[in-house]
C-alpha cells in the first residue's frame, strides 16, 4: 500500500513499511504500528 511518500503522515496500517528507515519519523508520533 504505497501511493506516495506523503501517505505515511496519516498511515497506520502502512506505518510498518515506511518505518524501516525510508522516511524520518518517530513511532507513535509520526506513525503507529497496527
Swiss-Prot record:
Keywords from the named record: Carbohydrate metabolism, Cellulose degradation, Glycosidase, Hydrolase, Polysaccharide degradation
EC number: 3.2.1.4
GO MF, one example: cellulase activity
GO BP: cellulose catabolic process
Additional information: Active towards carboxymethyl cellulose and 4-methylumbelliferyl cellobioside.
Disulfide bonding pattern of the chain: none
Superkingdom as given in the UniProt entry: Eukaryota
Protein name in the entry: Endoglucanase 1
Catalyzed reactions: Endohydrolysis of (1->4)-beta-D-glucosidic linkages in cellulose, lichenin and cereal beta-D-glucans
Taxonomic source organism: Sclerotinia sclerotiorum (White mold)
Amino acid at each position: 500500500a504505497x501511493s506516495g511518500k506523503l501517505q505515511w503522515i496519516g498511515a497506520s496500517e502502512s506505518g510498518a513499511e515506511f518505518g524501516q528507515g525510508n522516511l524520518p519519523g518517530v513511532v507513535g508520533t509520526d506513525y503507529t504500528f497496527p
